[in-house]
Amino acid sequence: MSFAIITDSTSDISPASAQELGIYVIPLHVIIEGEDLLDQVQITAQEYVARMAGSEQLPHTSQPSAGEFKALFDRVRADGHDSAIFISLCSEWSACYSNACLVAETHELDVRCIDSRTGSGAEGLLVEYARAMREDGRSLDETEAQIRATLPDAHLLLIPRTLENLVKNGRAPKLASQLTQMLNIRLAVSPEWKSGEIKAIKKGRGAKRIVANTMADCLAFLAEHPGSSVRVLTTGAAEEQELVSQALAGQDYVDAGTGPIGCTIATHVGVDAIAISYCPRYQPAN
């Protein structure tokens, strides 16, 4: 049997898509108003965002435990797989990756753990890249090597409505939030590939300006890597989504779908945020 593909729920691959693609997803925990829920298992992304918008308490998140990883690896092994690739969200953001590595060290399932250095749609595109390689008959070793080589080209651009949640959850400096409020500007942020740090990459007043400034990076990438996949996820942000769609019109890319940002990432970016992800597509040899 071919190797299994495992990811965590911050890849923002919906449960229905995961089932269709034959991908295992381990959920993170979201804690809102004292209730501990499994991301997109016990609460949908849409339900969570609606609840978060009406809550006076800032929700927070927690990684799967070592025991939860063991249970999943046991299930993958019981399904007949001898090996697997696990693609995790950025290890600087969570202990998800380290917990998986800890269990993989002694488990009978041969698990290759890959730190995606990103999250949300960009992580999901890497997962689907691995799946395309598996479907093309590529080996575990080949797939692992190619995914690692592709990591620097998997991009995630986030435009939150405000930086409040990122600051309160320790993902952005407080000064940046204060300055954006004082100057009435919005920031786009993105994970720095080597450090994992969330850094401001663009600024602009109003939705049109911040989207245009942010999409300049995406369009430059598509010019250099035509035919790449682009995925757009949101926690609302209808105006921004329409502006992104307009910016992409006529570009040479593959639409990898739209949908909701999952519960875990939504906790940090807040309501009315948009995530633009892009990554090269796997190209079969023949």
Q: Residue locations for each model-derived region?
A:
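Acidic/glycine-enriched edge-of-secondary-structure segments
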Residues: 49-65, 194-209
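N-terminal glycine-rich anion-binding loop in soluble enzyme alpha/beta folds
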Residues: 4-63
